[in-house]
Design a protein with these regions (language model features):
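A generic beta-sheet turn/junction motif
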Residues: 132, 554, 600, 727-731
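Outer-membrane beta-barrel domain signature, especially the mid-to-C-terminal portions
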Residues: 561, 658-660, 700-718, 749-759, ...
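C-terminal motif of bacterial Sec signal peptides marking the signal peptidase cleavage site
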Residues: 17-19
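Interaction-mediating elements
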Residues: 2, 21-318, 327, 339, ...
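Gram-negative/organellar outer-membrane beta-barrel architecture
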Residues: 164, 285-286, 305-549, 638-639, ...
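Flexible glycine-/small-residue-rich
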Residues: 40, 141-145, 156-158, 226-232, ...
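C-terminal outer-membrane beta-barrel translocator/porin domains of Gram-negative envelope proteins
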Residues: 265-268, 277, 361-364, 480-677, ...
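Bacterial N-terminal signal peptides that target proteins for export
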Residues: 1-9
């Protein structure tokens, strides 16, 4: 079957790569637009700045090399009534036929854009080169001599506004010697407008700021004047001075029925007065007044500030009890002049919801089922606190227990658990001032979880409790503080056969035995994420960007001190315990950096480095299994399946049993480069090269060759290469990656370099994941 398919595959590839079939779609006396370039004679005028002005681009190339979409389209025949031809045309890309009128419009827009940069005499010429029925087009920019600002004069006939601008002059974008750049001039108008709107000038906009430019004779110098126009609502109105507004009354309208009423009819509804604010509602208020006051930034008696309005929107958007909010202002005459009364309309969200999930499971051929039901309340204490509870149960029929099955109480796997969390929309901690809680945009969460697992070999109970905080700042940084996170593992039962197996494996696999012991982990951690493109972790950025993620955590130090005080001298070889439970003690740090280079709107290049180090000490000789690093998988070195690489040159056990336990380490290094390209429709492609491995800090007989050594670790770095397909569904990205081993540090000689003689069955690994790897 495979042999018979080869001729068809070869024929299709040849059809895609040959160009003769393109000509039948090119009309007579027309040309295929083969290439478009922008060329600039001036170093300061970068061609990449004008890509957005190109109205007609050539057919897209996969990986910037081959026009596969166009070739696919050209495989179709001329007869569009045949379904096969329609299919190829639908998935392909029709040849782009050069249009002179469109090119002239692009030429005009590029020329205008260059002149707006300060090159007033700039010209753009079209350079066309034809060969047979193909055309290559170049937009050649002749920028000429730039115009620069000689003097800057401010004509501001308003002492208050003039004083505000003088105080903020250090932030001004205007300065003698600058290019006469129209874009910068407009940005300065927007900056001043934003400044004044935050100083009470509610009706101010940038159109009240105009420039006057005078060019000195026979020079490339410009004398610039920035003038303030008086306020004039309509042409027929008399000009007047710009009015500065203060906030009068602030009213919260917390009911769906009030959303559609006029301000003058609010007396029909229930109301209360709280700390100078008015609340209107019908029946019972669904939010406490204190919550609304804390999340509001619009203060009575203060100057109007657009920034305060936006901050209020942002704060209210964090309240899950609200569907949406709307803020309106009404101009009124107060005792101290013109004021703005604020009306904050609040639409109530649905408080309660339930969800039920059923899933099938297949663990190494053992079939089972799982079900869960969850409940959520978004406004438990009328402060937009979110309570969640989830109950889960699972069952799996286990086969292949072998001769030891007579020692087992059953041949099934059962799991049941319950988890709950309570989320507060503020930083909840005793002794903190209310001002601090208002400034930091944080959420607090308390969580509890209990899980019971019953297998033929053992029974295990897992319990956890956590108290954490999350907050963001305006610098695109997200923070998380795990104040305390307690995890307890209890093994009430082990079958005699399973215990004998663990004892027999303890010498060559100490990590395996440690994974089935009672254990207590009490940790504290902090992590942050910064993304220069904003909250764009899932989507492809539209410009060069980078992201940084870092994490640090420690566990067991307080318990160690407490245990030392209670039992200062334990017996030799024994660990410190709390209530007869040994606890873990370690410190762990991770750093992750990714840089995205945009080549053009369809192609980008991404570089990533990830480093992690964890050190067990004191009461622990080994990290808890869930805190150890592993390599291989969809987000690591993709030529290896998950948890199948390392540590170091560790080859695994002879029988391969429980290798995933041993293939974990204390140090991790990941290096990745990835070329991403848009293919067609919602499909994107990627070509990647990955490198990395994991290592242990201490030598372990069960992980031979896994110890980290400065003079050897670089020789143990594994390398993989591969291709990937990404299906962009807008709300999520489905990723399919196929990796091949290039350098396998475990092997020696020629086998160490499978890239030279690849074998698909030995070197290939397939991965499915959601979202980008970095």
């Amino acid at each position: 079957m495979k042999k018979s398919a080869r001729p068809y595959i070869c024929t299709f590839i040849i059809a895609l790569c040959t160009s003769c079939s393109v000509s039948k779609f090119i009309p007579e006396d027309k040309y295929l637009l083969d290439e478009v370039r922008i060329v600039s004679e001036t170093k300061e005028v970068k061609p990449s700045l004008f890509n957005s002005y190109i109205r007609q681009n050539p057919n897209a190339k996969w990986f910037n090399l081959v026009k596969i979409p166009m070739r696919t389209y050209c495989v179709s025949g001329v007869d569009s009534t045949k379904w096969i031809n329609r299919f190829f045309r639908k998935i392909g890309d029709a040849p782009v036929i050069y249009d002179e009128s469109v090119a002239l419009k692009s030429q005009e827009e590029i020329e205008k854009a260059v002149r707006n940069m300060g090159y007033m005499g700039a010209t753009v010429h079209l350079d066309k080169k034809t060969k047979k029925n193909k055309l290559k087009l170049a937009y050649r920019i002749h920028a000429g001599h730039p115009y620069r600002v000689r003097h800057v004069v401010y004509d501001i006939d308003d002492l208050v506004i003039s004083d505000y601008m003088r105080q903020d002059s250090a932030q001004s974008l205007l300065a003698p010697g600058m290019l006469f750049d129209v874009n910068v001039l407009d940005t300065e108008r927007q900056r001043i407008t934003k400044l004044l709107q935050n100083k009470g000038y509610y009706k101010f906009n940038k159109d009240f700021l105009v420039y006057q430019a005078d060019t000195a004779r026979n020079t490339y110098l410009v004398d610039l004047t920035l003038r303030l126009l008086p306020y004039q609502r309509r042409k027929e109105d008399l000009p007047r001075k710009h009015r500065q507004y203060k906030v009068g009354e602030v009213n919260f309208l917390a009911d769906d029925e009030i959303m559609s009423v006029q301000e003058g009819t609010l007396e029909e509804f229930d109301s209360l007065r709280y700390k100078g604010y008015s609340m209107y509602y019908k029946g019972k208020a669904f939010l406490r007044p204190q919550v609304l006051v804390d999340f509001n930034r619009i203060r009575p008696g203060e100057l109007y500030s657009e920034q305060d309005v936006q901050n209020t929107y942002s704060n209210l958007g964090r309240l899950r009890a609200l569907k949406y909010s709307n803020i309106r202002f009404r101009e009124v005459n107060g005792e101290n002049g013109t004021q703005l009364d604020a009306y904050v309309f609040l639409a109530k969200n649905k408080n309660k919801s339930m969800a039920f999930e059923v899933e099938g499971t297949n663990s190494a051929g053992d079939l089972g089922a799982a079900a869960s039901v969850s409940f959520q309340h978004r406004n438990v204490f009328k402060g937009s606190e979110t309570f969640m509870m989830k109950v889960r149960g699972a069952y799996e029929a286990i086969t292949g227990l072998g001769v030891a099955s007579q020692d087992y109480v059953n041949d099934n796997y059962m799991e049941y658990g319950i988890e709950s969390s309570l989320n507060f929309p503020q930083f909840m901690f005793p002794f903190l001032s209310s001002n601090f809680k208002k400034k930091i945009r944080a959420t607090s969460e308390v969580g509890l979880k209990f899980t019971s697992q019953v297998r033929p070999e053992f029974s295990r109970t897992l319990a956890s409790a956590s108290w954490s905080y999350k907050w963001t700042d305006r610098k695109r940084m997200q923070h998380r503080l795990d104040l305390v996170d307690v995890n307890y593992v209890y093994m009430p039962r082990k079958s005699s056969a399973f215990q004998e197996y663990l004892d027999s494996m303890s010498l060559r696999n100490s990590a395996l035995k440690a994974s089935y012991e009672n254990q207590l982990v009490v940790r504290t951690g902090y992590s942050f994420t910064y993304n220069s493109a904003g909250n764009a972790m899932m989507r492809t950025p539209t410009k060069n960007s980078y992201s940084i993620r870092a994490n640090i955590e420690e566990a067991g130090n307080l318990l160690y001190v407490a245990s030392k005080l209670v039992h200062p001298n334990p017996k030799d070889g024994e660990d410190y315990v709390l209530a007869n439970i040994p606890f873990a003690q370690y410190v762990k740090a991770d750093f992750d950096f990714a840089k995205n280079f945009m080549i053009d709107p369809r192609n980008s290049f991404v570089f990533h480095i990830g480093v992690g180090v964890a050190y067990p000490y004191g009461n622990s000789k080994m990290l808890p299994f869930e805190k150890r690093y592993f390599s291989g998988g969809a987000n690591s070195v993709r030529g290896w399946s998950v948890r199948s690489l390392g540590p170091g040159v560790y080859k695994g056990s002879e029988d391969g049993r429980m290798d995933f336990i041993n293939q974990a380490g204390d140090i991790k290094l990941d290096l990745n480069i990835e070329y991403r390209t848009h293919l067609f429709w919602k499909l994107n492609g990627a070509a990647f090269v990955d490198a990395g491995n994991i290592w242990t800090i201490r030598d372990d007989s069960g992980q031979e060759g896994g110890l980290f050594k400065f003079n050897e670790f670089y020789k143990q770095i594994a390398v993989a290469y591969g291709l990937g397909i990404r299906f962009d569904l807008d709300y999520l990205i489905l990723r399919f990656d196929g990796g091949m081993k290039a350098i396998n540090p475990v092997e020696t000689g020629k086998k160490r370099y499978p890239v030279i003689r690849p074998r698909f069955s030995r070197d290939f690994a397939f991965h499915f994941a959601v979202g980008y790897p970095f």
